[in-house]
Amino acid sequence: MSAVIKHSEERLMKVLLAPVISEKATFVAEKNEQVVFLVMPDATKLEIKAAVELLFKVQVESVQVANRQGKQKRSGRFNGRRNHTRRAFVCLKPGQEINFTEEAK
């Protein structure tokens, strides 16, 4: 049951907000061959997969998403909250690689 779903290129360009470059993301990338992205809160797994394949010209094996709640913070006597974020853990097929540390050409 392989349904081909067409997404507009305009929407796919907006789905990925930024790559996550952190110690944990680097560990996951090395161990599980995954790449971590911040994505739009309403992005689906199929949209994330299509966006990564379109922008980086790689083949995606699977996508896992995690919704992170914003932390409660206090500034003086005022309470606030950081924004909620949605992260996508994109597993690439063997032999595929996205490297953000190289210099752009």
UniProtKB/Swiss-Prot annotation:
It comes from the Bacteria. One of its GO terms (molecular function) is structural constituent of ribosome. Keywords: Ribonucleoprotein, Ribosomal protein, RNA-binding, rRNA-binding. GO terms for cellular component: ribonucleoprotein complex; ribosome. GO terms for biological process: translation. Part of the 50S ribosomal subunit. Contacts protein L29, and trigger factor when it is bound to the ribosome. NCBIfam families: PRK05738.1-3, PRK05738.2-4. One of the early assembly proteins it binds 23S rRNA. One of the proteins that surrounds the polypeptide exit tunnel on the outside of the ribosome. Forms the main docking site for trigger factor binding to the ribosome. Belongs to the universal ribosomal protein uL23 family. This is Large ribosomal subunit protein uL23. The gene is rplW.
